[in-house]
Amino acid sequence: MSDVIDELAAQWRACRHLLVLTGAGLSTESGIPDVRSATTGQVRQPGCADALSLRFFQQDPAAFWSAFRTLFPFGTTGSACPDIGHRLLAQLAATDKTVTVVTQNIDGLHQRAGSPHVIEAHGSVERLVCPACLCRDHDATCQVQPVPHCHCCGEVLKPDVVLHGEPVEAMDAALAALAEADCLWVMGSSLEAGPVNQLPALARHWRMPSALVNLQPTALDSRFDLCLHWPIGEVCAKFRQILGFDSD
């Protein structure tokens, strides 16, 4: 593993603007389960996609919110803390290089860790939005209501995340960030969810150095210059040692 991490460190030293696409595997050490896991992922269960769809939210808001809170309980507790992966990316961003994070996660942990440039591809479970008036000014008391309502217009609030049937509006920002970057890393993503899984192919087309850090192989491994199939926590700890970063 050390030789490959040395190559990862060489990519870091050579780049000026690193783009990092992160997935659920980056947050598992924070105690947040990978809902897309091949063995335990809830979103693979029959009917789950329908329960997390815009259509179901519109048809039965109460049932939708019950299902959503079962799948994503961390959204109402805020108890999860950034792990070594989140902290490493924030530490890299504090150097003289630019680090942009495009995250598929909805847990807000990159921001809590201190990363300044975060594009939330799928939104954030920590926010609520009114689909009628688009108001986002809702306090924490709304989060604990069985069916939260907008204090501006009274309509049922939606979690500010991308549901099945909704477009990934942040994709434009992700593409713009990739165009400005000169290195792409993917950390903790199976690269099954589109459209952000198109980024590795674009990076390959542009001959951009790239690396994948994910416990399991993906169908897109051939798109990367480096593939590290080890626990992210171990990779990040070794990477920090190589760069001489202090532990925290």
Curated annotation (Swiss-Prot):
The residues listed in the UniProt record as binding Zn(2+), with positions renumbered to this chain, are 130, 133, 150, 153
Active site residues according to the UniProt entry: 122 (proton acceptor)
Per the database record, which ranges form the Deacetylase sirtuin-type domain? 1-246
Residue numbers binding nicotinamide: 106-107
What terms describe the molecular function in GO for this protein? histone deacetylase activity, NAD-dependent; NAD+ binding; zinc ion binding
Mind listing the UniProt keywords for this protein, alphabetically?
A: Cytoplasm, Metal-binding, NAD, Transferase, Zinc
Q: Record's GO cellular component, any one?
A: cytoplasm
What PANTHER family would the database entry show? NAD-DEPENDENT PROTEIN DEACYLASE, NAD-DEPENDENT PROTEIN DEACYLASE SIRTUIN-5, MITOCHONDRIAL-RELATED
Record-stated family: Belongs to the sirtuin family. Class U subfamily.
- Output this protein's name: NAD-dependent protein deacetylase
Q: Gene for this protein? A: cobB
